[in-house]
Amino acid sequence: SDVYKRQVRTLRHAGAVVNSSCGMHVHVDASKHTPQSLKNALSIMYSKEDILFKALNVNEHRVERWCQKVREPMLEKIRKLPTNTTMDRLRREWYEGSDGSYEHYNWTRYYALNLHSVFYRGTLEWRCFESTLHAGKVRANITLALAISAQAINQSRTVMRKTEISENPAFTFRTFLLRLGLIGPEYKNVREHLLSNLPGDRAWRYDKAQYPSLQNRRNQER
């Protein structure tokens, strides 16, 4: 975290400013990714993007133009590709038949998870984070992108199913963070920042009164 503090402090001293019109983009090295892992990354984003955008409090104007959600028809086609598909085939599906990998400002770059960046410069890009000069939030954003990237690489398969925003979104998203491996004191501050915009009880899915064992324990302690 000290590294992030020094870097953010350097930006501030250089005159950096942020506002609601701009975002923070996180690039992750894509050299370890395969067509299957990129398919996984898109599927994870599709599944979690509704609650993710709520957790990140993404500016609606940015969502409409600069960090759109996953294109469902495109993902459906990519998920139907055979497991041994090539990167060239995946690239054609991402660009919907053409090859825009040589274009800096190709239209497919304006998505929360940007695979154009993979084909253009070799990095997987997340564009959904709000701009900030808070070192803790910067670290949380980068850590989340790295964790999703790692899960996409390590996971053998994924499903294309939206995660519903339940009556307790804080618990739902915390569960996702724990499944990504963001567990323990090392990631406590990361979880705090990523959960700060979500209502609900982070530790309990339902009202504590609905758990008989917990109620019995309380009665015994009286």
Task: Give residue ranges: language-model regions.
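Short, conserved secondary-structure transition motifs
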Residues: 27-37, 64-71, 167-171
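Modules that initiate DNA replication and primer synthesis
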Residues: 111-222
